[in-house]
Amino acid sequence: MSCDCHPHVFGDPGKFPDRNPNPLQASREASFEDALRMHEAVGFRRGVLVQPANYTTDHCCLEEALARIHRGRYRAIGIMDDMVTDAELARLHAAGMRGVRFNFVRMFKMAPSPRLLQSSIERIGQYGWYIKIFIGPEELPNAIETLGAITAVPVVIDHMARLKPVDGARQEAHDLVLDLLRRENFWVLLSNGVRMSAQTSGYHDVVPIGQALHAAAPDRCLFGTDWPHTHSHNEGGGPPESKLIALLYRFLPDAAARQAVLVDNPARLHGFV
């Protein structure tokens, strides 16, 4: 069963208010039911819901979504800080959480301290969770030593590290990501190519990047829609998910690669059976 490894859900703002004092964009409702309809329309049978930055460590909306249709088909990724208790971690694991996300992108002002990152890794290790890293080429050189030292848990690099296609394989960040993917515990999410592209259609400039990342770690690549595209530059909220999947297919050489990225790899990482 195909898996979308990176949708977000937003509940009714009256019930689930923003917790981030400086959100880049106010939440607009995009319910779990809406996400399910999108998944059914494009053929996803599994999903990994990612906690929006707007909610910080308040996972109530995410927990409610998982409770509605967990049934072994959906997992979740949360946000971690020192205020998250051991009891919360146990409850979130039982609900379906399988990892935590750290945001290094400067404009969000949410980068973790090395101490928080290390303590979080130690705390989630008992559950077999992984960490997701949202980072871009501007932040990667300064973070590479910290990231390279992570060996105890799997690490998923979100959104192809937001690599810039205008620089192609010559940019420093491109080589740094490939170096990380040579480590057996590093994975990459082949997503957000449309936003990375300097083109308004076709998105040919990001195809070599996706192909290179897949070639570096074909058994550790995932895909995510990033629905509902909350920070899209387009008023319409981003391209149809069918276009995102079509772009993914251009990264992958054959049907076996598509099976791995959409079905086998996410099942192995998230414990789907």
PLM features: residue spans?
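Alpha-helical elements of Rossmann-like donor-binding domains used by nucleotide-donor carbohydrate transfer enzymes
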Residues: 34, 61-64, 119, 142, ...
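Mid-domain alpha/beta scaffold segments of enzyme catalytic cores
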Residues: 1-127, 204, 243
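Catalytic pocket-lining loop regions of alpha/beta-barrel enzymes
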Residues: 113-223, 231
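Short, electropositive alpha-helical surface patch
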Residues: 57-73, 157, 209-217, 238-249
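Active-site environment of divalent metal-dependent phosphoester hydrolases
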Residues: 10-13, 54-57, 83-84, 107-108, ...
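Divalent metal-coordination and catalytic microenvironments
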Residues: 6, 62, 100, 124, ...
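Mid-to-C-terminal alpha-helical segments outside catalytic/metal-binding sites
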Residues: 1-3, 28-46, 218-220, 234-273
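A cross-domain feature marking catalytic cores of carbohydrate-active enzymes
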Residues: 7, 50-51, 78-81, 102-104, ...
